[in-house]
Amino acid sequence: MSDLEFPFEYREGQRKIVSGVYHTISTERQIFVQAPTGVGKTMSTIFPAVRAVGAGLGENIFYLTAKTITRTVAEEAFSILKEHGLKFKVITITAKEKLCFCDKTECNPENCLWARGHLDRVNDAVFELWTTQDSYDRDTLLEYAKKWQVCPFEMCLDLAVWVDAVICDYN
C-alpha cells in the first residue's frame, strides 16, 4: 500500500487534509475537518487512512456516516482506490431494518425463517462471500443471504469481523 498514490490531482486544500489525517492517525489523536461540499473530503480522509493501515498504524478503517449519499461516496472512494491497486475487503453495514427480509424484525427462529437454521449455514455463506468478493454492499449481502437462507444482518456482522474497512451507515 505504500506505493498507492492519490487517485486524482489534488484540489485546493486536499493535500492539507490528507497530511492532517495521516498525522492525526500516526499520533493517535483526533481531527475535525470542515470544508465545503465538493472539496473531496471523503477521498482526502479515506486515502491517508488506507496508507496508515498499510504502514502498520492501524488494523481497520471505520467510516461512519448518517446519510445514504455519504455512504455511497465512501463506497465509490474505496472502489476507485481498488482500481488503483488497493487490496482491501470493504463492507457496508446498514441498519437491521433495512437489511431484514421480514416485515417485522423479530429475530428468533420461531418468528423468522431467516433466523431458523441460520447458525447451521452462515459459516458457509461467509466463506463463499469471502472467497469470491472484495466489496460487500447491501445488494451483495442480500443476494448471498437469500442464496444461503440466513439473516443478512447477522451475516453482515459475522463478515465485518474479518474485513479491512467498514462503512457504517447508522440510519
Feature roles, as predicted:
Residues 15-19, 23, 44-47, 151-154, ...:
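Short, contiguous clusters of charged residues that form electrostatic/catalytic patches at enzyme active sites
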Residues 20-23, 42-57, 77-81:
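Walker A/P-loop NTP-binding motif
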Residues 27-31, 52-62:
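Short, surface-exposed connector motifs at secondary-structure boundaries
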Residues 28, 163-164, 170:
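Short, well-ordered alpha-helix to beta-strand connector turns
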Residues 27-47:
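Walker A/P-loop
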Residues 11-15, 39-43, 68-72:
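Conserved structured core elements
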Residues 2-7, 57-166:
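A substrate-engagement module of RecA-like helicase motors
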Residues 1-34:
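Conserved pre-motif I regulatory segment
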